[in-house]
Amino acid sequence: MGPVYVSGYLALYDRDGGELALTREIVAAALPPAGPLPINIDHRPRCDIGAVLAVVDDDRGPFFLGVVNCPQLGAVLARAVGPDFFGDMRLSDEERLLYLLSNYLPSASLSSRRLAPGEAPDETLFAHVALCVIGRRVGTIVVYDASPEAAVAPFRQLSARARSELLARAAESPDRERVWHMSEEALTRALLSTAVNNMLLRDRWELVAARRREAGVRGHTYLQATMWAGLLPKSGASPAPGPSAAMAAPPSAAPGDYIFVPAAQYNQLVVNQRPAPSLESQLGAIVSAAMDRRHRRSPSPEPRPPARKRRYDDYAQDNAYYPGEAPPPASDLAAVVSSLQREISHLRAQQLRYPTPYYAPAAPPQLLPPGAVVGHPHPHHAAGALYPPMYAPQPGLHAPPPSPVAHAVPALPGLPGLQGLAAPVAHVPAQVVPQQPVVVQAQPVAVPAAAAAAPAPAPAAAAAAAAPVQAAAPAAPASAPQPPVQASVSAPADVSAGTIDASSAAVACQRGADIFVSQMMSQR
């Protein structure tokens, strides 16, 4: 296994503050360093795995190029990696080491000597460079590759002057062919320490991606910066110039491999995949937020001496003074709300028991023949009086089922021609009785003179006579066939007391549920 080259910015000018700040004057005084700068793992002593070949002063900050050549490092990482980490990628040992180093130690950290008050920096300011997970300075991301040119190429904002000077000094460095040997036990401890010390680092890969953008790295091959386990195939990695470019040739797309959809439609599909939280969860979150705000607003209670009988008068304290005296937690309220929601669901399910009655579709309306009489007789109208013309019912139309509360009543006094009329009984509510006039095919009924001259009927009789009635058609001659009497359904809402409209039931259940919830919540 040959050497691995690493490069990157040690700092960016005017981007850090405090003791991490490096100005152009300090860097100019510290370069070139008095001796070779070792490269170790996470600033651990006696854990050198390489050395810095050259450091140049770029317009953006100090930039270094180093070499890592430790055979034991590749052996330890190769034994630690899982068998499925590389997937189906057929890689050499050198490429495996490049992938592991790029994603396990993607940053660099410059260690410098702390200056005394009034001390001027000199060539001994820089101590060493450590490979780590996340550096404290801005833009300290590194790139590993098999050659110096390929390691420097992804830094697109590096000036041409600094690039050429860096490669020239690295070619003359005596440490380019040096090999560093360490015990595998010490390397294992150093790598494990790095993992343990950074296991609580929040948004690790987001920080790595941000540092990569700050350093101007584009076209890298081995740094994945992904949150998923395993490595992406080479077709997903961006190619880098140099010897590594031949390894990252993406396959050509075959017809039908991609589907192009608008961005708005894609975003809508992604949003719809997320299941909405349940109503109980939302209510529980609201209750918890309200309790949290109340705890924050309430001032801390003053210390008081313990009392023999002390009730929970401080809502900011959730601890119980005596068994059974703890304030009710917010989970109880959430349980009550869940119970109320189950009651509402039960009430809404009642509408399934009363389906909406079905009526056959009516034929296009037609006008009555000229000789037909439309309307129904009324005791206060003269004989032969007619109502305004209306549309006649068509064959095949079905009327709503008869009301079970309607009963036959005897003939009304003074109206002998209305025998056998059906009228609602007195105990039926007014809103259940049909109020629309019933259209029938009938002949004009003549009212006798005695009935016309008779005094006005009693209020009860008048109310019964004013109610809508259904008059039977006069009997036709025996020779002519009698057409069936068809009822009109001009008012589909005309239903009996035994049939409940589904929409009405839903409204009634909804109102009842709302009243029930409001009463229960007011008591809580």
Curated annotation (Swiss-Prot):
The record marks 225-226, 502-503 as: Cleavage. One of its GO terms (biological process) is proteolysis. GO terms for molecular function: identical protein binding; serine-type endopeptidase activity. One of its GO terms (cellular component) is host cell cytoplasm. Residues 289-311 are annotated as: Disordered. It holds the Pfam family Peptidase_S21. Residues 256-275 are annotated as: Interaction with pAP. It comes from the Viruses. The active site is at 43 (charge relay system), 109 (charge relay system), 128 (charge relay system). Keywords: Host cytoplasm, Host nucleus, Hydrolase, Phosphoprotein, Protease, Serine protease, Viral capsid assembly, Viral release from host cell. Its EC number is 3.4.21.97. Residues 504-524 are annotated as: Interaction with major capsid protein. Region of interaction between pPR and pAP is called Amino conserved domain (ACD). The region of interaction with major capsid protein is called carboxyl conserved domain (CCD). HAMAP family: HSV_SCAF (MF_04008). Belongs to the herpesviridae capsid scaffolding protein family. This is Capsid scaffolding protein. It comes from Suid herpesvirus 1 (strain Kaplan).
